[in-house]
Amino acid sequence: MFGAARHSRRGRGTALVMGGVLLAGAAACGGGDGGGDDKKPHGGPKAPASAAGPRALTEAQLTAASFTDGETVGKYTASEFTLGAPHSDDYTADPAVCQPLVSLAADVTDHDMRSEVNRRVDVAGEMLGLSVAVQLRSYGGGDAARVMKALDKAGRKCADGFTEVRSVAKGKYLKVEPVRAPEFGAGADEVRAYHFTILDVKGKLRLHDYLTVVRSGSTTLSFRADLLGTKDFGGVPESVTDAQWEKFRSVVAPG
């Protein structure tokens, strides 16, 4: 599996790659149906925001709805990323139809993303422990629903694997499997959840990532969990998804 909160993790993963350890992508196919360059998402101007679809939330609203720096969720602690957003435009997929499984950054997709807030959730002091990248994104023109459609297509088209391309390395995804999604309840329009099996850079070890994305109106909440090791840890901790969802709903739909 897309990295749990990691420019922390992804940053750690990159450091391990460059140090010759194992990560090629414990974090996170092509071309559209109309052909073209399979290695990059099709460019072109983004569609203008239309009146269709729910109103996009502002960055201030997303910030209020997200975990705060230092907030605790059971044994986990939330923090802000210090090296920029995780799963940024440095991450692309080959073939390109798999891009939503790697990164939904504005510069590598054609969706009208208006605002984004990113948090890292992990166990304080555990460098090699489980880490979750929590990303809240708001879209205009009904594009949040199109993000979920693209994610669903990627999950089907890329089931047998694809390549994640980064500036310092390539990661081989061996398998993309749908898994049981959490029950978010009222306000959740649709949910997708996946398990990724990833080959380490040396081509010897199998790593695991899990991705859960839920849409509520114009907003998507993405949870990507990873572990720097070969253990299949079973999925994104529901204590994290539940706590973030509850906080999000308390802000966007109080009462």
At which residue positions do the language-model features occur?
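Surface-exposed amphipathic alpha-helical segments
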Residues: 226-255
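N-terminal low-complexity, Pro/Thr-rich disordered segments
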Residues: 13-17, 23-65, 92-96, 102-103, ...
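Extracytoplasmic/secreted envelope proteins and their assembly/folding machinery
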Residues: 63-69, 145-148, 152, 238-241, ...
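Post-signal-peptide N-terminal segment of Sec-exported extracytoplasmic proteins
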Residues: 53, 60-89
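A small/polar (G/S/T-enriched), proline-flanked helix-loop surface module common
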Residues: 77-206, 240, 252-255
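Short, surface-exposed beta-strand/loop micro-motifs that present aromatic residues
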Residues: 208-216
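Short, well-ordered beta-strand elements
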Residues: 132-135, 218-227
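Bacterial N-terminal signal peptides that target proteins for export
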Residues: 1-17
